[in-house]
Amino acid sequence: MFSKLTPLAETNIPPLLCANAAGRLLHSDSRQIKQGDIFVACQGEYTDGRSYIPAAIVNGAAFVFWDDDGNFAWNPEWKVPNQGIKDLKHRAGILAAQVYGNVSDDLKVWGVTGTNGKTSITQWLAHAADLLGEKTAIIGTVGNGFWGVLEETTHTTPAPVDVQTLLYRFRQQGATAAAMEVSSHGLDQSRVNGVPFRSAIFTNLTRDHLDYHGTMEAYGAIKSRLFYWHGLKHAIINVDDEYGAELAGRLKKDCPDLAVYSYGFSEHADIRIVHFTASSDGMEAVFQTPWGEGRCRTRLLGRFNAQNLAACIALLCANGYPLDKVLDVLAKIRPASGRMDCIMNSGKPLVVVDYAHTPDALEKALSTLQEIKPQGAALWCVFGCGGNRDRGKRPLMGAAAVQGADKVVVTSDNPRLENPQDIINDILPAVPHPERVEVDRAVAIRYAVEQAAANDIILIAGKGHENYQDVQGVKHHFSDFEIAEKALAERR
């Protein structure tokens, strides 16, 4: 059930080749190649990068690494220095790290994996570390860069060459640490091979991506790879999660040199939340830790965010920061974009935009809002499910909405290439009495804002920070936040 896979052995590149490559940027997308760059032509899941070698050369590639699987021959008309590398798909990250001079070894790289919570934790770690004097970069769902200045990205964990290029650039820009979301796809597809993780956090394991992994057992095994990583010093595990508790126990047996820190509400946790209170203004929590006990009051909402704070405390303290200073900076943290993001207008409903797109995340978001809901008020939930993804998750999302909300509006999410009504039809058996079924997500949001009472709470779930809606392969501009803000402004 648990994987002990470690990164592949270092790819040996002739020193002269490294000398020629030094100072150049590597890309695995020919469209990103500029004069003097290096093109890495891998075989991908859907496309073969070697077919783009001519385009990369036209764009100015000065060198090409290509996947040598025995069935490909270099065209002598491509008059560019090159080298074939066997199994390049899995070695690309290690290759790129070596070409860049392994500068990422000079960074404290913190990896965060789990079904939910990755974005919040990486954002908070970077912000908190910055406030503690550690210039910290971010790689993740919301974007790549530095806290408050992120460039949009298409993947939670980028392609392996892109990961190493980002780390190289961050180091050149003065970063001394990097907080990185590590997706199960990223681990399974070798996107993080070559990354020198120093500390890793496991948040939870709940149903998601079964269209890719097939079973929860396979999904969990992929996640566990990060904690058997060569050179890892700290494993920080949520033991309120069943799989996390099992993983923590296994790591303590398998890895005697690894510092394993458990966190959560559990009485067995090393970083234990011993007191928690919530209000519409935020929360207050008391943490017992190996470094002492302390209190933190923040504007964050939810028990799950208390767990996320505990993870941040564990990682930062394990990396040498004093507990009192860690708690001081965490008190200043704000929600990550699209994560329990509140829109408040006096005399109007409280609207909360959240990325919750799994049954567990939706259940937790709704239970958090039920805790702070005024007496006699209603909690609304506006949600849908993504197309071309795990269909079995759809009725579970519906059940979570019915269980946690007083009024449910079923709508579209990112239908992608599916008919949105078909997706809704998969949800509806679990939602026998919806307040409204509306394919048009903008109309659904406006309906909830218009119909809710002034003291009601509306959760708009599923898309969070996203500023697009994917319909038939085309991404149209769409922001839950913008639509809700406008609807609130127009409400009388």
Language-model features and meaning:
Residues 2-111, 121-133, 268, 272, ...:
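Short, basic phosphate-binding NTP loop
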Residues 1-22, 32-38, 44-51, 61, ...:
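ATP-dependent carboxylate-amine ligase
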Residues 65-73, 140-143, 240-242, 265-266, ...:
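Short, polar loop motifs at secondary-structure junctions
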Residues 72-76, 188, 197-351, 428-432, ...:
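Acidic, Mg2+-coordinating active-site environments of NTP-dependent enzymes
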Residues 9, 90-239, 245-258, 310:
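Phosphate-binding loop of NTP-binding sites
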Residues 57-59, 75-77, 193-196, 226-231, ...:
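Short, conserved loop/helix-junction motifs that constitute active-site signature segments
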Residues 16-26, 93-95, 158-161, 180-186, ...:
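Short gly/ser/thr-rich secondary-structure transition/capping motifs
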Residues 67-69, 182, 204, 239, ...:
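Short secondary-structure boundary segments
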